[in-house]
């Protein structure tokens, strides 16, 4: 008699009918698969004391190996088999235990934050859990959920099932609501039906003892040693808790600049960037992956040429930073000089600091004044030559990222409260930031303390006038001897990204958008108050502007299922209509929340307060891409303007489209706003290579799934421009180009078009041609984990 060893160690006789029940359940109601084919191809070699786990893994591997373009449903067979195995690991049977048991077990193991479950009616919420929704997962989706998101104990044993995860996240994010059971259920319904999804940090950490829910952070470094090294500390803390980082270094004086009155004393930004590179490597996010830091520099900075070469493998290694992601902050004036084939002047920010505070006409006026000033240090380069160098690096390495300073700031709804200095790691977040401000703290021998600005002139009792930062313990002020003079900081602003995405493959009607968008805006607004913040400054900034970033994913699937060709007129009209609805209901919800919970602190004098919305500042050329133009809008925008003026806004920033690769895999849709990579490819996982087929591939959708490399890159830019009309922040936009189609002229046309159509940024240039080998593996090594 052949026996099997169960997971609990019990030995019992082999019962073939149990295996057949599993294989039948796994293949039921799925086209193109069969129970008998699964059992035959598994070639199970039964032997005495074979483990049930081995049988299960063999069946899963068999199903995975059968996933192909003409048989995509084997992915759902593999997912069901994996789920049956997961149920037994977590519950001890094929199903769910009570929600209360799940919480008590996870709390006992120290994995769930204590104290919030008691606020809820657990009996009611348990009755609303829908285990059948687990069958929405394809195999890569459930594997991704298991590997990255489901809670595990100290021995890496899973203690959570998918629907419990969605419900506990919903409860955590609804715990401060008045009608908390109702709101928790609304959150659960949207998440568990894959109608929308939170970004990775929220999915992974909401409900846990370390509830760091934000995706990434954006900061700025001042031009002094104290500020530069305070920035490293801040980056380290933010990276420690899993945040991606975008950081502006444009204020740091250039190579050859003055230090303490001595010319040619400064080594410039590059040595400081090298230290930032070491921070990214040293603070490696719990040992799972190195930190991810994008560094931004204004294009007029004297160090720009070296900055572009930051990741080059040749040259002086002391002036290289191979693990940073360089990004250029590009102004309109530079792009105009490129088109005019004119000269471009580079400056030292030590002498031209105010250029970092200006944009548009004010920037151009000041820049021209500096060009004429003979006392200012400057260097000259042909603008077109610099542009060629940028594009060549972009083609060879996919970097530096490009972000357009004036496009970003022209459409900043909070321009009254600051300036946008850079974007984030994935180039979709655009919010005000500010470096720390440093001043002098003078402590006297009698214990008294007095404060001065660094450059404030002070006259000592010896009748010597000097800047406050030159005071020492030998000085006496008004009869009081100085004990020590130190430099102290007043916090600037470090912006925060709290992200989620609407799944367009499921939510693409006016009725559904009207239902789902308000739920997700409320959810993201709650993230702000329930988040764990790594330091005081980021919390203060987030509470000041209450920024969120609602985006979309699944655009390619939605288009294919509606039989709309990418880049067609129908495509642009469709996304124009969808983005109008999403923008309208996001703003409307924020206005409703403002009435319910209060306005964000900087609302007064903002563009919102004047009834000026993103569409009102849309790029004129982008408006011409669809017939809608300035008119024929489907929504009552005038009524909403009056409502916002009356109610205010809960959130200073509302929309941003992030990359979403992880969460789009999770819900089984196409990535963000991008076309597909191929109809079939392989994802690398801890388990090996997993075949993936685009969702819902069939006779009707086949011709409408077009590879990104077969689409004119300018069509990607035009589609992005149509979306951008409705978005207050930005989009993470990759450009795809076959190597054989690449040329300097082509790259120039693509990126100048992006600028002309009002885009705020572009992300990677993916120029490698997809392999003709069937085993094409999608490279995700360069992607930001946190914005997904």
Swiss-Prot record:
Residues binding ATP, per UniProt: 6, 12-18, 52
Keywords per UniProt: Allosteric enzyme, ATP-binding, Deoxyribonucleotide synthesis, Disulfide bond, Nucleotide-binding, Oxidoreductase
Residues forming the catalytic site: 424 (proton acceptor), 426 (cysteine radical intermediate), 428 (proton acceptor)
Annotated InterPro entries: ATP-cone_dom, NrdE_NrdA_C, RNR_lg_C, RNR_lsu_N, RNR_R1-su_N, Rrm1
Residues annotated as domain ATP-cone: 2-92
Site (Important for electron transfer) residue list: 763-764
PANTHER family tied to this protein: RIBONUCLEOSIDE-DIPHOSPHATE REDUCTASE LARGE CHAIN, RIBONUCLEOSIDE-DIPHOSPHATE REDUCTASE LARGE SUBUNIT
Reactions mediated catalytically: a 2'-deoxyribonucleoside 5'-diphosphate + [thioredoxin]-disulfide + H2O = a ribonucleoside 5'-diphosphate + [thioredoxin]-dithiol
Family: Belongs to the ribonucleoside diphosphate reductase large chain family.
Protein name, per record: Ribonucleoside-diphosphate reductase subunit alpha
GO molecular function terms listed in the Swiss-Prot or TrEMBL record: ATP binding; ribonucleoside-diphosphate reductase activity, thioredoxin disulfide as acceptor
One Pfam entry name: Ribonuc_red_lgN
Interacts with thioredoxin/glutaredoxin (site feature) positions: 784, 787
Its EC number(s): 1.17.4.1
Regulation of this protein's activity per its record: Under complex allosteric control mediated by deoxynucleoside triphosphates and ATP binding to separate specificity and activation sites on the alpha subunit. The type of nucleotide bound at the specificity site determines substrate preference. It seems probable that ATP makes the enzyme reduce CDP and UDP, dGTP favors ADP reduction and dTTP favors GDP reduction. Stimulated by ATP and inhibited by dATP binding to the activity site.
UniProt entry tagged with the keyword Cell membrane: no
Cited SUPFAM superfamilies: PFL-like glycyl radical enzymes, R1 subunit of ribonucleotide reductase, N-terminal domain
Protein purpose: Provides the precursors necessary for DNA synthesis. Catalyzes the biosynthesis of deoxyribonucleotides from the corresponding ribonucleotides.
Gene field: nrdA
Binding residues for GDP: 200, 424, 428, 661-663
Cystine residue pairs: 216-497
């Amino acid at each position: 008699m052949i026996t099997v060893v169960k997971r609990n160690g019990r030995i019992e006789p082999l019962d073939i009918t149990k295996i057949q029940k599993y294989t039948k359940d796994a293949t039921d109601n799925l086209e193109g698969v069969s129970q008998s084919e699964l059992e035959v191809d598994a070639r199970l070699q039964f032997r005495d004391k074979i483990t049930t786990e081995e049988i299960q893994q063999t069946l899963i591997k068999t199903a995975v190996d059968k996933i192909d373009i003409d048989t995509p449903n084997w992915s759902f067979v593999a997912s069901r088999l994996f789920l049956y195995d997961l149920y037994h690991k977590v519950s001890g049977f094929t199903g769910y235990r009570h929600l209360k048991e799940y919480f008590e077990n996870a709390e006992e193991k120290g994995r769930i934050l204590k104290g919030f479950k008691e606020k809820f009616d657990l009996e009611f919420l348990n009755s609303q859990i829908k285990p059948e929704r687990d069958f929405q997962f394809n195999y890569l989706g459930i594997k991704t959920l298991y590997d990255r998101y489901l809670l595990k104990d100290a021995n890496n044993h899973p203690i959570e099932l998918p629907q419990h995860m969605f419900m506990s996240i919903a409860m955590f994010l609804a715990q401060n609501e008045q009608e908390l059971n109702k709101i928790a259920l609304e959150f659960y319904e949207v998440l568990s039906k894959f109608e929308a999804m939170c970004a990775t940090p929220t999915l992974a950490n909401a409900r846990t003892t370390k509830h760091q829910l934000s995706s990434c952070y954006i900061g700025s470094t001042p031009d002094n040693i104290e500020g530069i090294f305070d920035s490293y500390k801040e980056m380290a803390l933010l990276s420690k808790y899993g945040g991606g980082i975008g950081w502006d270094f444009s204020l740091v004086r250039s190579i050859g600049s003055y230090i303490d009155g001595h010319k040619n004393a400064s080594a410039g930004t590059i040595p400081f960037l090298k230290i930032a590179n070491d921070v990214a490597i040293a603070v490696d996010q719990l040992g799972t992956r190195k930190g991810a830091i994008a560094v931004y520099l204004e294009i007029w900075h004297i160090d720009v040429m070296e900055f572009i070469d930051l990741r080059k493998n040749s040259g002086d290694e002391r002036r290289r930073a191979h693990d940073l992601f360089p990004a250029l902050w590009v102004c309109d004036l530079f792009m105009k000089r490129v088109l005019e084939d004119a000269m471009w002047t580079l400056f030292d920010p030590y002498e031209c600091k105010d250029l970092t505070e200006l944009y548009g006409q004010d920037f151009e006026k000041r820049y021209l004044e500096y060009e004429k000033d003979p006392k200012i240090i400057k260097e000259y380069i042909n603008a077109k030559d610099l542009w060629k160098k940028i594009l060549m690096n972009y083609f060879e390495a996919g970097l530096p990222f490009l972000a357009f300073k004036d496009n970003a700031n022209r459409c900043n709804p909070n321009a009254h409260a600051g300036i946008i200095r850079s974007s984030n790691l994935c180039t979709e977040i655009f919010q005000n930031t500010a470096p720390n401000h440093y001043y002098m703290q003078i402590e006297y021998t009698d214990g008294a303390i007095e404060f001065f600005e660094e450059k404030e002139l002070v006259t000592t009792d010896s009748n010597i006038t000097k800047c406050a930062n030159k005071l020492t313990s030998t000085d006496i002020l008004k009869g009081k001897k100085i004990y020590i003079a130190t430099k102290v900081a007043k916090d600037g602003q470090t912006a925060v990204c709290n992200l989620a995405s609407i799944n367009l493959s499921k939510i693409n009607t006016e009725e559904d958008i009207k239902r789902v968008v308000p739920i997700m805006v409320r959810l993201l607004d709650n993230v702000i108050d329930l988040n764990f913040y790594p330091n005081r400054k980021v919390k203060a900034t987030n509470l000041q502007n209450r920024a969120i970033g609602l985006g979309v994913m699944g655009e390619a699937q939605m288009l294919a299922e509606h039989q709309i060709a990418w880049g067609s007129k129908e495509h642009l009209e469709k996304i124009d209509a969808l983005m109008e609805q999403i923008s309208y209901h996001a703003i409307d919800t924020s206005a409703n929340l403002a009435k319910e919970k209060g306005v964000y602190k900087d609302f007064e004098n903002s563009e919102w307060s004047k009834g000026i919305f993103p569409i009102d500042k849309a790029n004129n050329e982008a408006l011409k891409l669809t017939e809608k133009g300035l008119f024929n809008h489907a929504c009552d925008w005038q009524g909403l303007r009056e409502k916002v003026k009356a109610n205010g806004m809960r959130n200073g920033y509302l929309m941003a489209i992030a990359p979403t690769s992880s969460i789009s895999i999770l819900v089984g849709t196409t990535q963000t706003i991008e076309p597909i990579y191929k109809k079939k490819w392989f994802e690398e996982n801890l388990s090996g290579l997993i075949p993936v087929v685009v969702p819902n591939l069939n006779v009707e959708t086949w011709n409408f799934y077009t590879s990104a490399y077969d689409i004119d890159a300018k069509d990607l830019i035009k589609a992005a421009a149509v979306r951008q009309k409705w978005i207050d922040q930005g989009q993470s936009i990759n450009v795809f180009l076959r190597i054989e189609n690449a040329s300097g002229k082509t790259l120039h046309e693509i990126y100048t078009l992006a600028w002309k159509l009002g885009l705020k940024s572009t992300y990677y240039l993916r120029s490698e041609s997809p392999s003709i080998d069937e085993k094409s593996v999608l490279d995700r090594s360069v992607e930001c984990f946190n914005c997904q």
